[in-house]
Amino acid sequence: SMYPSTIMTLNISPETKLGKLIGWNAKEFIRGVTKTYTLEVDGREKGKYNQDELKEMFDNNQISVSSNGVMYRLDRKGLIPVLLEKWFNERVEYKALMKKHGDAGEDDKYGYFKRRQHVQKIILNSLYGVLGLPVFRFYDIDNAEATTLTGQDLIKFTETITNHYYNKELGDKKDYCIYTDTDSVFYPALPLVQKRYPDADVSNDEFMTEQILLVAKEVQDFINNGYNYFATKFLNVRGEHKFDIKQECVAKSAFWVTKKRYGQWIINDGGLTCDKLDVKGLDIVRSSFPPAMRDLMTQVLKDILGDVDKDEIDEKIMKFKKEMKTTDIQNISLPTGVKKLKKFKDVTPKDAVFTTMKKGTPVHVKAAWVYNDLLKYWGLNNFEQIKSSEKIKWIYLKPNTMNIKQIGFKGYDDPPKIMEFIKQNVDYDKLFTRALEKKIRMFYEALKWDMPVDKANTLAVSYTHLTLPTNGLG
């Protein structure tokens, strides 16, 4: 947990905050750039320091300095770091138990402690989150920014020194970093493994994983040694720091759609052999996505990661589109929650069948009202209406005698008459376009692919090459 580690390292807490250096830049300070720094305490100027004076103050006092220039005393631990350290140690214990039971093949206990350590991670990060929350008792925007900006500098530093390791090992000046996230970096292991084993069979997962873990351990140790320099030179923390990076997983392939939205085919997770899809930020796995479409897009992602030919993926998508008409409505309708139904109700004429909706009413709310109105209109009084805060499903309809564009339903205990009406009037083309095509396009554009087409219904035109006589047409 990078943010909690940053808070503990800098000793960020309301009672340890000393002031803020205006104009602070760690790299300039390390290089000895001549400049004057202004010290502010509670927004008031308390003094000015040149390069030498500031260095003397740092050398003679136990003071840390964050990337945004906030200084903290280090001679005693602050309240927030003490709490975080307790929770942090508990997470370390849970992770050790997770690994122990994982190595022993005890899947249930492994799963329990994996979830437990993840809960602990959320608790740790939540304390950072409230630092920037105005209603929090210890709210301080300087402390919140000190955490995030220092964390950003740490990841940039990690990227820089890891590239240095690769460049030294491989004898080049390339940037090998694939991707950086808030608290992680992604690097290809293949260049290092192939440098050491030129004839290695890269398709041998067992051999590659073994070598990758060895290489990752070397890189991991190199980075962690570099963190000693970062803590001392960038933050003026000369004693213990909490920065520690660890190899997390080995992915056979990965696919980035955009920043923070990607999928990985993982074959080793935390030192344990596996074969699973890991998805971050892609809404294809969200519960608000129709189950059948979720299954399709998950398979498409797996195919992309497995380097399946585009034509084969296209065929699966077009086959799904054709078979939508025979798919259970429950599996292709859009699941969602519906709230504050009455809020969107407008003045409705007495003889109107359907309730008038206010401008800007969300489509799923309109769909829920249509369902309730049909219950009344058709006298289906034995069935419960959709209520606020319920989970529903809804779907687009093609032009029909009732002039209904969309309709919701509960997904259980629904009147057969309404369900039959839905079945007869589903607008499959609109549903595919609105719910699925955008997701497909997002993947295909990232790969620079053309969108899939139905080849069976695409007009193919043959051309005959004609050569004109050289002496003209006359």
Predicted features, each with a name:
Residues E15, V92, A96, G129-G132, ...:
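Non-catalytic alpha-helical coupling and interface elements of nucleotide-dependent molecular machines
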Residues W87-H101, Q120:
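Non-transmembrane amphipathic alpha-helical segments
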Residues D183-Y187:
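A generic structural motif
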Residues I122-V130:
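Glycine-rich, acidic and aromatic/proline-enriched surface loops and short helix-turn segments
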Residues H465-G474:
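Single conserved hydrophobic/aromatic residue that forms the stacking wall/gate
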